[in-house]
A protein has these predicted regions:
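ATP/NTP-dependent adenylation/nucleotidyl-transfer catalytic domains that generate, transfer
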Residues: 1-54, 58-165
Length: 165
């Protein structure tokens, strides 16, 4: 696709933050995992600000519906060209574009830790989630999980609460 990439190694920054946090709290696995997406967000915005650019979002309708994103991490962006597409639709689009098989066949992963995949972490397949989003129908156990995840993550999609006293 000839897209320019640059790499910033945030490993030492993450390690330093985790070390600093030891003096104030004991980090849960979820809190620890969400540091990386938030560091990526601050890095993307720093580069964008320095170069007069905007940050592109990579989240999709499937992830947004169940809240499978880090608030103020990978959920932060200035624009998002794929926000209204499900994972299924994104893969269809990639096939249409002629994307390499290694991209299409790779299991979706937020990269939160080694060996992590979205579906294993969610306990839900994108096929079931997307069927629900596109048709309103899916396996009953999957539907129950989808509805619970959607309700539990409403705070991620809602506007910031403000005091109007």
């Amino acid at each position: 696709f000839r897209i320019e990439t640059r790499t910033v190694d945030l490993t030492p920054v993450r390690a330093a933050e985790l070390e600093a946090l030891k003096s104030v709290t004991e980090m849960t696995d979820a809190a620890r995992a969400n540091i990386a997406p938030r560091l990526r967000m601050t890095t993307l915005y720093a580069v964008a600000a320095a170069e007069g650019r905007l940050v592109a979002g990579t989240g999709n309708r499937s992830e947004a519906y169940v809240g499978y994103f880090t608030k103020w991490g990978d959920g932060a962006h200035d624009f998002n060209p794929i926000a209204d597409l499900t994972v299924t639709e994104i893969y269809e689009f990639l096939r249409f574009l002629g994307a390499p098989a290694c991209v299409i066949e790779k299991a979706p992963s937020a990269g939160l830790f080694d060996g992590q995949t979205d579906e294993s972490e969610m306990g839900l397949s994108y096929a079931d989630l997307d069927a629900f989003l596109l048709t309103g129908k899916t396996d009953s156990a999957a539907e129950e999980k989808i509805r619970k995840m959607h309700a539990a993550s409403e705070h991620k999609r809602a506007p910031i609460a403000t005091y109007r006293g």
